[in-house]
Regions:
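Short, Lys/Arg-enriched N-terminal segment that forms or immediately precedes the first helix
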Residues: 1-16
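Exposed, low-complexity/repetitive linear segments and helix-based recognition motifs
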Residues: 4-6, 26, 51, 68
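N-proximal short alpha-helices
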Residues: 10-13, 25-29, 57
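Amphipathic, hydrophobic secondary-structure cores in small proteins
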Residues: 23-53
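C-terminal structural segments of small proteins and small subunits
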Residues: 46-73
């Protein structure tokens, strides 16, 4: 992931978009709530469409791991 970075000194080590303190989680929550990519870009004008798409790719990559659903809820 080129645009997503994890640094223990930034946002407690949460994945963020490089050069910002905007977490991937924040972007994903906007999209999950029904906001469009364009809505996110209006809210965070410093981001690019590629930044938002990278958050989706990052999430998809995490989902490739196998989890027992009982352990997550």
């Amino acid at each position: 992931m080129k645009r997503i970075v994890i640094d223990p000194d930034i946002c407690n080590g949460q994945p963020v978009i490089e050069g910002t303190r905007i977490t991937a989680r924040t972007i994903l929550e906007f999209l999950a709530a029904g906001d469009t990519v364009e809505d996110v870009l209006e809210e965070y004008p410093s981001l690019s469409k590629e930044d938002v798409l990278e958050c989706l790719r990052f999430s998809a990559e995490l989902m490739k791991n196998h989890y027992r659903l009982q352990d997550l809820v």
